[in-house]
């Protein structure tokens, strides 16, 4: 199964190392090289002094497909893109790393003794998945410039949708980075302080050891001197050696007690400095938390203001949207009203056109029907009469004309009321004139029928009826003449009617042409209206489309703003809740910390008072010790010089020691030889001691006598001193008198006499006291 690969590439500001290709089949340890594990190209062990042995762990999680890095309680820390994973000597949670991240192990450390700077490991990491593809880059992750620690191997990738929140996170990260740098500086200062304390302790220990060595050398020198003396008594030699050893033990115990006292004082001063530092750190943390609280409150206020601004913008946009919707509705209503008006006009024109067409069709149908009736009547009359049909034709034509005229008058009635009245008057006149002819025609038809009946019934009476027929013919001729006259009159009337009909036709034609022109103009208007309606509809459609697009845009923008507002609300609520929780936690922590700190403060105050008193005393002692230290430094300098001299003396002493050892060998032989002599001498010495004892008793008696003499001389001396004082007083009085008067020439002689008497009195006493 293929495994994931991590490549560590050295950067210019790093401690130099070869490029490492590490396969992450299992969690890989990153650390300092030791005897068991040496640096190689396939491991993460580096030859660098600032790394810990078990500095960090790196591994690949097959479930999530992500790479993780964990700091394992390293002393100098692990950094991803200049962000420390944990505080000093604390284990960090697993943190996701991406390809292209800058990984730093440890920090640069400078040695004060040799002034050498040890560099840290800074590398660019490239990560490859088991399938050979490179892992995600940091630039591909949106708004996640720095990795964040995860709990239980789950990447906590922040999802930021706002530039302000991103800047806020950047500011927080920069503040954390500055805090980490300050912590590192404090750690380095603490380390330097510890180093200086260790250096002072070592220097003090060296001073004490050197003093011990000097005292030991002095003791050895004294012992050497004691041994080099040709003493005859071993007891005196042993006693001197014991006294020197006692002196050395006393000095060592005194110096040890002094060192212990100084160490206790230094420990107290160190504890005091630690307490002061912890107090200053807690105060700094309190001020930092207060500043963070104020900053977060200001940021929340800014977010609230921005949210209110966004809400106001949303309200303005909603108002604009409502105004646009109102305008669109007005435009739609206007378009609908115009469309309805145009449609109504079109419908009216179409109805008028249909009515005119219906009227024309009705007139045409009536005309056809009347023509059919007239043709039928003509045929019937022709079949019945078979005679002169001119009158009938004229009558039919007249009837046709009358029918046409009636139809035309009907049309004129519908079009114009005035012409309708005239047409009705003319029709009434025509009906009056045609009524006798109609009656006669009806009588003729009845006579024809009667004739047919007579012809059918009585053919025999033909001859009789011929005479009657002739008479009737005469009468009929008369009637025909009368009817011809009437026809002429009717023809004249018909001509007049023709003229009127022609005029009416012309008027009708004019009206028809005018109506047709009106229809054409109406059609043109309808077309124009259709075109205008289409244009208006197209414009309205375009306006509606543009308005709909704008409406969609506005709605989309409104929806976006609403989503943004909802997201802002969610973020604000989450931030408020988290901030409230954080504030509550901070308040609880601050309360607990405050109570704890108050208790500690009270303790510290008590300790401070105690320590202050001790500090004053220690300061005084420190001044004394500093002066003593300066003196001892001077002595140390002198002792160093003396030590150099003593080293030379030691070499000489070693030479002399060798010689003395040789001499001791010879002395032992002499001692063995002299032991017998010493025994003899010892017996002699015992005898001499007895003699000395006797002499001692004698001297004791002499001493008692001398003491008595001394007391007597002391009394004499006291009396002489009193006399001398009196003489001095008298001399002063005499000098004062001499200053007032002329000096006496015998005064020096008197002073010399007094001095001589004092000497005479004082010297014998001394001579007696001296034996």
From Swiss-Prot:
GO cellular component, one term: FAR/SIN/STRIPAK complex
Parts of the chain on the Cytoplasmic side: 1-745
Biased composition (Basic and acidic residues): 420-429
Transmembrane segments: 746-766
Entry's free-text remark on domains: Alternative spliced transmembrane domains determine subcellular targeting. Isoforms 1, 2, 3 and 4 are targeted to endoplasmic reticulum membrane as well as mitochondrion membrane. Isoform 5 is not targeted to mitochondrion membrane but to endoplasmic reticulum membrane.
Role this protein plays: Associates with the striatin-interacting phosphatase and kinase (STRIPAK) core complex, forming the extended (SIKE1:SLMAP)STRIPAK complex. The (SIKE1:SLMAP)STRIPAK complex dephosphorylates STK3 leading to the inhibition of Hippo signaling and the control of cell growth. May play a role during myoblast fusion.
Protein name per Swiss-Prot or TrEMBL: Sarcolemmal membrane-associated protein
Species: Oryctolagus cuniculus (Rabbit)
């Amino acid at each position: 199964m293929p495994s994931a690969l991590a490549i560590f590439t050295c950067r210019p500001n790093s401690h130099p190392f070869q490029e490492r290709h590490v396969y992450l089949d299992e969690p890989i340890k990153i650390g300092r090289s030791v005897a068991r594990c040496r640096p190689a190209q396939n491991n993460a062990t580096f030859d660098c002094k600032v790394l810990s042995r078990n500095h960090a762990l790196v591994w690949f999680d097959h479930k999530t497909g992500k790479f993780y890095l964990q700091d394992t309680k390293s002393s100098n820390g692990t950094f991803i893109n200049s962000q420390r994973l944990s505080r000093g000597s604390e284990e960090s949670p697993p943190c996701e790393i991406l390809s292209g991240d800058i990984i730093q192990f440890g920090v640069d450390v400078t040695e004060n003794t040799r002034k050498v700077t040890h560099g840290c490991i800074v590398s660019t990491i490239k990560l490859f998945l088991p399938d050979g593809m490179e892992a995600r880059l940091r630039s591909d992750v949106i708004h996640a410039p720095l990795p964040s620690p995860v709990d239980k191997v789950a990447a906590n990738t922040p999802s930021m949708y706002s530039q302000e929140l991103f800047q806020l996170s950047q500011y927080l990260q920069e503040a954390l980075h500055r805090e980490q740098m300050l912590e590192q500086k404090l750690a380095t200062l603490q380390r330097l302080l510890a180093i200086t304390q260790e250096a002072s302790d070592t220097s003090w220990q060296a001073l004490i050891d050197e003093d011990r060595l000097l005292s030991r050398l002095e003791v050895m020198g004294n012992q050497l001197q004691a041994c080099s003396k040709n003493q005859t008594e071993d007891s005196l030699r042993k006693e001197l050696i014991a006294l020197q050893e006692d002196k050395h033990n006393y000095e060592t115990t005194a110096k040890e007690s002094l060192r212990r006292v100084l160490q206790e004082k230094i420990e107290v001063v160190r504890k005091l400095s630690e307490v002061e530092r912890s107090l200053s750190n807690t105060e700094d943390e309190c001020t930092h938390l207060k500043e963070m609280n104020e900053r977060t409150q200001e940021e929340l206020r800014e977010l609230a203001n921005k949210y209110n601004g966004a809400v106001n913008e949303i309200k303005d946009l909603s108002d604009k949207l409502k105004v646009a919707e109102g305008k669109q509705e007005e435009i739609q209503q206007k378009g609908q009203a115009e469309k309805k008006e145009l449609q109504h006009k079109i419908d009216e024109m179409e109805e008028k056109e249909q009515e005119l067409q219906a009227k024309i069709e009705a007139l045409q149908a009536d005309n056809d029907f009347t023509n059919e009736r007239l043709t039928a009547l003509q045929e019937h009359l022709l079949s019945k009469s078979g005679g002169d049909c001119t009158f009938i034709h004229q009558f039919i034509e007249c009837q046709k004309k009358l029918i046409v005229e009636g139809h035309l008058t009907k049309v004129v009635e519908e079009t114009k009321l005035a012409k309708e009245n005239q047409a009705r008057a003319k029709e009434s006149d025509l009906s009056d004139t045609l009524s006798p002819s109609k009656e006669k025609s009806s009588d003729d038809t009845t006579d024809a029928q009667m004739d047919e009946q007579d012809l059918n019934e009585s053919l025999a009476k033909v001859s009789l009826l011929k005479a009657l027929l002739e008479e009737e013919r005469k009468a009929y001729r008369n009637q025909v003449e009368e009817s011809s006259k009437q026809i002429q009159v009717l023809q004249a009337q018909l001509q007049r009617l023709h003229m009127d009909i022609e005029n009416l036709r012309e008027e009708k034609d004019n009206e028809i042409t005018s109506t047709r022109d009106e229809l054409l103009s109406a059609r043109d208007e309808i077309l124009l209206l259709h075109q205008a309606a289409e244009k208006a509809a197209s414009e309205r459609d375009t306006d509606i489309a543009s308005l709909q697009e704008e409406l969609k845009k506005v709605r989309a923008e409104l929806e976006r703003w609403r989503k943004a507002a909802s997201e802002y609300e969610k973020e604000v609520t989450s931030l408020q809740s988290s901030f409230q929780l954080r504030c509550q936690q901070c308040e609880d922590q601050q309360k607990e910390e405050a109570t704890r700190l108050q208790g500690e403060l009270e303790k510290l105050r008590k300790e401070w008072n105690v320590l202050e008193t001790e500090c004053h005393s220690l300061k005084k002692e420190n001044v004394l010790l500093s002066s003593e230290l300066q003196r001892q430094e001077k002595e140390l300098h002198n002792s160093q010089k003396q030590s150099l001299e003593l080293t030379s003396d030691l070499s000489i002493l070693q030479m002399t020691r060798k010689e003395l050892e040789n001499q001791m060998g010879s002395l032992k032989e002499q001692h063995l030889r002299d032991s017998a002599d010493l025994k003899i001498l010892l017996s002699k010495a015992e005898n001499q001691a007895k003699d000395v004892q006797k002499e001692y008793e004698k001297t004791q008696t002499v001493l008692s006598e001398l003491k008595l003499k001394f007391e007597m001389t002391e009394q004499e001396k006291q009396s002489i001193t009193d006399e001398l004082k009196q003489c001095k007083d008298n001399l002063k009085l005499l000098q004062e008198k001499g200053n007032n008067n002329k000096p006496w020439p015998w005064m020096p002689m008197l002073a010399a006499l007094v001095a001589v008497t004092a000497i005479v009195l004082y010297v014998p006493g001394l001579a007696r006291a001296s034996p």
